[in-house]
Amino acid sequence: MVGGLTHVDEKGVKMVEIGYKDVVFRKAVAKGRIKLKPETVKLIKEGKIEKGNVLATAQIAGILAVKRTPELIPLCHPIPITGVDITFDFGEDYIEVTCEVRAYYKTGVEMEALTGVTVALLAIWDMVKAVEKDEKGQYPYTRIENVHVVEKVKTHNSQ
């Protein structure tokens, strides 16, 4: 281990050995926010975005991202996920996305939750590009921000 990093030693980069760990209930919750024009948030709530159902698309994208996290983050272990929930809270000029991931396994699921929330936010951006662009084709208001883990659980039961 180099400087307290579990993925690096004197031989280089490695995937951490977890074979000796017990299988326990794991949960992680991550949140993030996309700032949008108030008019865009209203259109999403009313289901009037021409490209399609923004929230359903974001949910599917987030769930797929959770399942593919070890393909995107090189040193993540493939984890048998037991459940994923992607939910939304609305403000006047933003949508906050929450991704909750659950599993019974030997290592945590926080990277999966972070990946899920980030890709869900990116999917929202993709779905609303046409209404968020200004006259020069730029996105002066649109921002993805504050992606973070809000809860991490490790317990020998699911409560």
Swiss-Prot record:
Substrate binds at residues 75-77, 111-112. The active site is at 126. InterPro entries: Mo_CF_biosynth-C_arc, MoaC, MoaC_sf, MoCo_biosynth_MoaA/MoaC, Mopterin_CF_biosynth-C_dom. Keywords: Lyase, Molybdenum cofactor biosynthesis. GO terms for molecular function: cyclic pyranopterin monophosphate synthase activity; GTP 3',8'-cyclase activity. One of its GO terms (biological process) is Mo-molybdopterin cofactor biosynthetic process. It is an enzyme of class 4 (lyase). Its EC number is 4.6.1.17. It holds the Pfam family MoaC. Pathway: Cofactor biosynthesis; molybdopterin biosynthesis. It catalyses: (8S)-3',8-cyclo-7,8-dihydroguanosine 5'-triphosphate = cyclic pyranopterin phosphate + diphosphate. Belongs to the MoaC family. Catalyzes the conversion of (8S)-3',8-cyclo-7,8-dihydroguanosine 5'-triphosphate to cyclic pyranopterin monophosphate (cPMP). NCBIfam families: moaC, PRK09364.1, PRK12343.1. This is Probable cyclic pyranopterin monophosphate synthase.
